[in-house]
Amino acid sequence: MSEMEQQPICKIALGIEYDGSKYYGWQRQNEVRSVQEKLEKALSQVANEPITVFCAGRTDAGVHGTGQVVHFETRAQRKDAAWTLGVNANLPGDIAVRWVKHVPADFHARFSATARRYRYVIYNHRLRPAVLSQGVTHFHQPLDAERMQRAAQCLLGENDFTSFRAVQCQSRTPWRNVMHINVTRYGAYVVVDIKANAFVHHMVRNIVGSLMEVGAGNQPESWMAELLAAKDRTLAAATAKAEGLYLVSVDYPAHYDLPVLPMGPLFLAD
């Protein structure tokens, strides 16, 4: 038995930030770039053994994360700096470990989570941006953020989100519990901030797509409630683009004592 095999297995959680614009999503896939594949490769180099990670939320192609949480198991005995600075040295520049925490055996990045929070960032200006073009969604028509805010409040609580669910969604149920949804303007940026126990596929982007129709004056404020009641995806607006969406935080029971960082995206006020 090798010295590595004699070491006890420990479970470690990491906070991950990434720019998803050059990846085909979080999940490892054959022959395409994924965030999971890059992270596992870097961790395996530091651990000197194969590492498999489990995440809180599998983001789609082009979607970003400032508050993704993962866990993995390893026999490798390393200082915390190895799992942060060491792993970051082996990662591409658009993925970074933000924190590390040793967690008990019952912790699971996905199944221990009690809520997930996303922010969708709209650059609301008649001319398109260049510097942040892969980190925001450009919408050239003027948006009334206060109108969007009022229209969105009907989504609070536990509801059937069939009208905002992708056709290919594999979830067993369309019911989700939305804890808050806020629409706020920061200068030229309009941010939709939504927190729920979980999300059906494309739920945030489908909600934002419809809210932009309300904000632009193309639909009345009451339209969001009508869509929710209709339970018909074909009645809602087109899915908003991926580049404006960020997974910004994941909630866990307090006894895990995971680090809490500023929400992000970092170019906006928290």
Curated annotation (Swiss-Prot):
Catalytic residue list: 60 (nucleophile)
Pfam families assigned to the protein according to its UniProt record, in alphabetical order: PseudoU_synth_1 (PF01416)
Alphabetical UniProt keywords: Isomerase, tRNA processing
Gene Ontology biological process terms in this record: tRNA pseudouridine synthesis
Residue ranges, annotated region (Interaction with tRNA): 168-172
Ligand binding (substrate): 118
Catalytic reaction annotation: uridine(38/39/40) in tRNA = pseudouridine(38/39/40) in tRNA
Classification via InterPro entries: PsdUridine_synth_cat_dom_sf (IPR020103), PsdUridine_synth_TruA (IPR001406), PsdUridine_synth_TruA_a/b_dom (IPR020097), PsdUridine_synth_TruA_C (IPR020095), TruA/RsuA/RluB/E/F_N (IPR020094)
GO molecular function terms listed in the Swiss-Prot or TrEMBL record: RNA binding; tRNA pseudouridine(38-40) synthase activity
Region RNA binding, residue ranges: 107-111
Site (Interaction with tRNA): 58, 78, 110, 126, 139
EC number(s) reported in the record: 5.4.99.12
Annotated family: Belongs to the tRNA pseudouridine synthase TruA family.
Description of how the protein assembles with itself and partners: Homodimer.
Function noted in UniProt: Formation of pseudouridine at positions 38, 39 and 40 in the anticodon stem and loop of transfer RNAs.
Name the record gives this protein: tRNA pseudouridine synthase A
Source organism per UniProt: Klebsiella pneumoniae subsp. pneumoniae (strain ATCC 700721 / MGH 78578)
